[in-house]
Each structure stands twice: as C-alpha cells, then as structure tokens.
C-alpha cells in the first residue's frame, strides 16, 4: 500500500515528466533549483513562526508545505523517495549520544 508521501512524490515526478500548464509544481521546475530552495527557506520560516505562535493547526499546514517543497527538490535532483525512506529506516532505533553531535548554540 502506498502512503500519502509516496503518492505526493509520484504526483511531483509525474508533473516533472509530463508538465501540465498552470501547475505550480511545473512552475517550480521551470524556475529551477534556486527557486525551489528559496521556497524551502520561506516555508521553514513559516514553520518557525507558527510554532512560536503556538498555532498547531498552522504548524501542520506549514510542515506539509516544507515537505512538499523538499520532495520537489528531491525530484529536481533525481533522488528517489526510496533513498530517503531507506535512510530513515536505517536511522530508526539507532542510539545516538548527545556527545556525538555538534553543540546547539542558543539563540
């Protein structure tokens, strides 16, 4: 059974391979990687604002926007979703020690 992420990614790849006029996804592909990256940055900022405002409904919507634009980037770079899924699966359940990671600077 395909999940929502798989279906979304398949739709994005379909738009890339068979462009539809007036498609926002095709607009992003036509503008290229810089535009896609800019949109990811904008959407990440909106996630931060929604979280700081304690607006969980808006936070969910903005997180979906981030994921969508990240999926567009993956398609642009010809990285299959299965590569991401495999990486998540590999990391799942691994014990990570705080000392193994860089220090997080406070704001």
Curated annotation (Swiss-Prot):
InterPro entries linked: HisE (IPR008179), PRib-ATP_PPHydrolase-like (IPR021130)
Name recorded for this polypeptide: Phosphoribosyl-ATP pyrophosphatase
Known catalytic reactions: 1-(5-phospho-beta-D-ribosyl)-ATP + H2O = 1-(5-phospho-beta-D-ribosyl)-5'-AMP + diphosphate + H(+)
Keyword field: Amino-acid biosynthesis, ATP-binding, Cytoplasm, Histidine biosynthesis, Hydrolase, Nucleotide-binding
Family, per entry: Belongs to the PRA-PH family.
GO cellular component, one term: cytoplasm
Top-level taxonomic group: Bacteria
One biological process term in Gene Ontology: L-histidine biosynthetic process
Primary residence: cytoplasm
The keyword ATP-binding is assigned to this record: yes
UniProt gene name: hisE
